[in-house]
Amino acid sequence: MSKLFFVVFLCLIISVFAISPADIGCTDISQADFDEKNNNCIKCGEDGFGEEMVNRCRDKCFTDNFYQSCVDLLNKVYEEKDTPPVQE
């Protein structure tokens, strides 16, 4: 299992260095902004959601709701709510 995790992690790391804004159709974004947003997507993928999460996060040049959900997840916006008390 650890070998599989290592391979997936390695693929994610390689994808960081192998992608530029033009590769996904982002022509109106600076390299610095792209790198920051792309790193957010990769962090979501590292949290166990995988390459599909990274790809969906990058959709529409990071303007899709999926990107915002990823950022919210990283910022722990989604917290578990307390369960209501059991009434007897």
UniProtKB/Swiss-Prot annotation:
Extra remark beyond the main annotation: Co-purifies with alpha-latrotoxin-Lt1a.
Keywords: Secreted, Signal
InterPro entries: Crust_neurohorm_sf (IPR035957)
Tissue spec. comment: Expressed by the venom gland.
GO cellular component: extracellular region
Free-text function comment from the UniProt entry: May increase the toxicity of alpha-latrotoxin and/or other venom components. Is non-toxic to mice and to the cockroach Periplaneta americana.
Signal sequence residues: 1-18
Parts of the chain that traverse the membrane: none
Upper lineage: Eukaryota, Metazoa, Ecdysozoa, Arthropoda, Chelicerata
Compartment(s) of residence: Secreted
Broad class of where this protein is predominantly found: secreted
Family as reported in the entry's similarity comment: Belongs to the arthropod CHH/MIH/GIH/VIH hormone family.
Protein name: Alpha-latrotoxin-associated low molecular weight protein
